[in-house]
Amino acid sequence: IQSTSMDQGILTEDSMNSFIRTLIQAGIWKNKVPKQMARTKDGTQTTVKKTEAEADAMASQDTRLGFQPIVSVDAELLRQQRRFSSPRVLLSENTPLEPPPLYLTEEPVVLNRTSRRKREGKSHRGEYSVCDSESRWVTDKSSAVDIRGHQVTVLGEIRMGPS
């Protein structure tokens, strides 16, 4: 895989999509026959496909050793994409020692949904509180607070149609 020049700033969604598209086009996410780059006598690079027999021999050797690679990525490609940081995606040359935890919980989930997780002091990656729930008796039905926090007047009667 050969990379194109990217600006050294923050990676945009388009550049990440382009990176993923490059991986897919190179057959990394599909089980295609691997390609190798070879130099000819005049110094130009050409793409050489491994034969099916070589690929099958490598696959059977890996299976005997108990190693089944999911993805084959060139290390240089990973070094070029180090700038990308996300809590959900990690580009690395090394395989992880164990799968990541789905939730970072210290105790069982509380059934009371009205309490905010921020108040409990626990962090759950990927989970964000939308709003605080407030439970109280309504005594004044003529005014309310809208979703933007503004005080609004509640209409006592709404007329519909011709009257």
From Swiss-Prot:
Belongs to the NGF-beta family. This is Neurotrophin-3. GO terms for biological process: cell surface receptor protein tyrosine kinase signaling pathway; modulation of chemical synaptic transmission; negative regulation of neuron apoptotic process; nerve development; nerve growth factor signaling pathway; neuron projection morphogenesis. It is found in: Secreted. Glycans are attached at N112. PANTHER family: NERVE GROWTH FACTOR NGF -RELATED (PTHR11589), NEUROTROPHIN-3 (PTHR11589:SF4). The keyword Methyltransferase does not apply. Residues 4-119 form a propeptide. Keywords: Cleavage on pair of basic residues, Glycoprotein, Growth factor, Secreted, Signal. GO terms for molecular function: growth factor activity; nerve growth factor receptor binding. SUPFAM superfamilies: Cystine-knot cytokines. Its main location: secreted. InterPro entries: Cystine-knot_cytokine (IPR029034), Nerve_growth_factor-like (IPR020408), Nerve_growth_factor-rel (IPR002072), Neurotrophin-3 (IPR015578), NTF3_N (IPR045815). One of its GO terms (cellular component) is synaptic vesicle. Seems to promote the survival of visceral and proprioceptive sensory neurons. Residues 1-3 form the signal peptide.
